[in-house]
């Protein structure tokens, strides 16, 4: 399975790639890691393929006289036209994507890169400490990734280790029964409730795992989700 780890800056993508790939290896799987972030100084793990061995954001800035944002866009265009190793003998290949999500998600490059791989899915990470009061916004962002990249996308809430047990259980309740817990008290709340109802009409509800990329909490559930996506007979709800 080719697993692309997406998410906003600071959501914990690289740490998840590092520790989830180590977890899979301990479970007996052949795992490879791929770093597609040309701007990172140190991802914290040794990737089996690292785009920085070919170019970096800094090298593009020097070569073309671009600023950081222009260099990132150029890097994404180069990535889209590259042949990325597929590591055919691996059970799972975990891809670390750029820290700045927008150029990857909202330009054609991201779809072209991911579209070059069969048997694929996306893990879309969110920072629980920043999102626990805006879970609908996070879910809509993950849904955007699903539409844009045309790939099965699992929304994952990271950093559960930074919540108290009571806070974590409160988030789980919201994830399990968002409509029951939504009590419109203003225009924004009413809009949120109606959006939730509309989404549930067209998209079957899926699990939203709460994980910790740091401690490994929730990794077993992520592996189960990979099984279910792979066999197409599983139940993601």
Where are these regions (language model features)?
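Conserved strand-to-helix beginnings and helix N-cap segments that scaffold or border functional pockets
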Residues: 17-18, 106-108, 135-139, 220-223
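Active-site glycine-centered loops adjacent to acidic/histidine catalytic or metal-binding residues
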Residues: 37, 156-158
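Well-ordered, non-membrane alpha-helical segments in soluble/globular domains
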Residues: 133-142, 188-193
